[in-house]
Regions:
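Conserved thiamine diphosphate
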Residues: 108-143
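Thiamine diphosphate
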Residues: 31-98
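Short beta-strand segments
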Residues: 20-22, 68-69, 94-98, 154-158
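A short acidic, amphipathic alpha-helical/loop segment
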Residues: 9, 80-84, 140-143
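Glycine/aspartate-rich loop-and-adjacent alpha/beta segment that forms the canonical ThDP
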Residues: 36, 146-184
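Long, charge-dense
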Residues: 99-107
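Active-site diphosphate/adenylate-binding microenvironment
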Residues: 1-46
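Conserved active-site and cofactor/substrate-binding residues in soluble primary-metabolism enzymes
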Residues: 1-5, 25, 47, 51, ...
Length: 184
């Protein structure tokens, strides 16, 4: 399963729930697959989607907030996981797409083959799940509908050579439409 296939499945299952999406190819794929006003695309802030997602979850306790992170992104900001685990937002679902690569910056390897991200998440009070194929991912997405967070879902994906188009919406417009979507 590649990133785009995983994003298609997840967005189909979660509907219009808000998504804070990390920078790079992840945001491009989400934009291509399912652009909506409830998506907040990180255009350039590597490693900060989880921190922003936490703030959004705290201020919007009645909405389920999804964070889409890459393995490279979360490894840059592991401290956010300890903060999330301490605050324990019941409405936060942290999805980490793991291809063992900083794919957006040239494909350099991350340490995710050596570092057990789900054990780190579990040690800081997340409920953890791992999906390595579409069937398992769909099963987990159905299961977590009735779970409270924080939830950590690692999705093992393959690298891809297909690069999505750049997001053609001004970052100010992305912010404005996302903010409006939260008050509706």
């Amino acid at each position: 399963m590649n990133r785009k296939e995983a994003i298609e499945l997840i967005t189909r299952k979660i509907g219009n729930e808000p998504i804070i999406c990390s920078n790079g190819y992840m945001s491009r794929d989400l934009f291509y697959v399912n652009d909506k006003t409830t998506n907040f695309y990180m255009v350039g802030s590597m490693g900060l989607a989880s921190s922003i997602g936490l703030g959004i979850a705290i201020k919007n306790p009645k909405k389920r907030i999804f964070v889409f992170d890459g393995d490279g992104n979360i490894l840059m900001n592991l401290g956010s996981m300890t903060t999330i685990g301490t605050i324990k937002p019941k409405n936060l679902v942290h999805v980490v797409f793991d291809n063992n690569s900083h794919e957006s910056t040239g494909g350099q390897s991350t340490n995710s083959e050596i570092i057990n991200l789900e054990k780190i998440a579990q040690s800081v009070n997340y409920k953890t799940f791992v999906a390595g194929n579409k069937k398992r991912l769909e099963f987990i997405l159905n299961k977590i509908k009735s779970e409270t967070g924080p939830i950590f879902l690692k999705v093992k994906i393959s690298k891809t050579s297909k690069i999505g188009s750049r997001i053609n919406i001004d970052p100010i417009i992305i912010k404005d439409r996302f903010q409006r979507s939260l008050i509706q």
